[in-house]
Amino acid sequence: MALTIVWALWAGWSLLGRATPYTLRVLDDSGAPIAAASVDINDSQVGTSAEDGTIEVDWNRSATVLGVSAAGHVPKTVTIAERPDGLFDVVLKARILRGRVVDPGGTPVESASVIAGPATGTTDAEGRISLRGAEPGTVTVSRPAWVPTTFEWDGGVGESVVEIEPFIARAVHITGEAAEEDIDRFFEMAETTELNALMLDLKDESGLVWYDSEHPVAAEVGATRAVYDLSEVAARAEAAELYLIGRLVVFNDPTAAVRKPEMAVLDSATNQPYQANGQYFLDPTDPDARSYGLGLAMEVCEMGVDEVQFDYVRFPDKRTETTTFDGGVSLETRTSTIIGFLEEAVALLHPMGCAVGADVFGFTTAAGTDDGGIGQRWEEVTGVVDVASPMVYPSHYSTGWYGFDNPNDHPGPMVTRALEDGMERLSRNVVVRPWLQDFGYTPEQVRTQIEVAEQFGMGWMLWNATSDVTVDALERE
């Protein structure tokens, strides 16, 4: 009997002294559960909340001071006098970073990425962002083809305004053959001149793929030449602090058009791939043709290219009544097809860290709603891509353009007028980096074009089809 009484007294004392748990739930002030919130009792940490915001907390029969904190939220302290019945909710107020991103001239920068601790978002058309759950400290602001920047945020409620600058690339064109022959000379050229970028042919107008691609279509049509290791070139460019732009010719592709005619623009009169002046085009409305170009773009981005510059991202400009496309060739079809391709490229490449550029005919900067029959309209292209590169070669303008009988004789005024037209018609704040003529000109004429571009605050790329760069037009370092 005595032993029974002692055991009963011990059991009762033990039960009374044992901590009894209850369930705490941590919520955001929007009502959403907060995972990984830190919980402490009387300054001693007891654990972190689960995915549903809950955590089991022991109750020790006395008032406790509960501390709860979570990234991106204002910490909260709660005194609990009695054991809660059921769920005990603690609501944390989310910190909100309100900001605006502008360029050095104060113009809003759309689609800039803002990262503040666990919170990420992008700016709207006015350059503004309201970032819920932001963490005080270093905030990173970036946008493809722009120079990333950081600023310190103290968690305050005012609007933070931060400037971000476009990357001003100064590049020359390197063909696949030139890279195979002597790619070193271009790195040496960059080391001794003002160049800070290289434009390297990945796939050119021949349809040949010059890097070590593993894309199955490139292999199937015999396009892969692999004259350079792209990952090694990218690593070398990064070490030399050079911005690497990869030129990818999309739809002008005689290699794939002839060997995979199901992807090609067809001539209904012959039922063969359509060709004009030696050019064969893949059909921009054909899903497989689009997928080929996008697949190569993703591959080169993974290999270290900073920017993919899509060239010949258009319909063929010389067509007859027998030229046929899977999806038709109306104005609406042409423009929506090209913009759709570029939008898909942005969606695929931005998460991989690559900028998206597009080469466009020079006339598009002044063409208004006319797409020239190729699907390129300046306002629409600049509304999608990170970098728009009009080919403002004076030799490509016919008599009468901007009042000149022979536009090629007036490199400075021609480039000036073309860029003025383009800048007046931008649909948003986007990097404009023109292709400049580096063929048939003296060093002084090439330099004149460079100076015009720089007066607009732009970078530039020199085009020479054989990479015979006019080095004397470049400033020496």
What is the predicted function of each stretch?
Residues P33, S44-E56, I80, P108-E110, ...:
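Short, acidic Ser/Thr/Gly-rich low-complexity loop/linker segments typical of extracellular
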Residues L24-A35, R98-S111:
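Structural motif
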Residues V385-T399, P411-E477:
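Substrate-binding cleft of secreted/luminal carbohydrate-active enzymes
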Residues F167-E181, G246, F251-E299:
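Active-site-adjacent "subsite" loops/lids of carbohydrate-active enzymes
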Residues Y243-D253, Q309, R334-G375, N429-Y441:
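Aromatic-lined carbohydrate-recognition surfaces of secreted/lumenal glycan-active proteins
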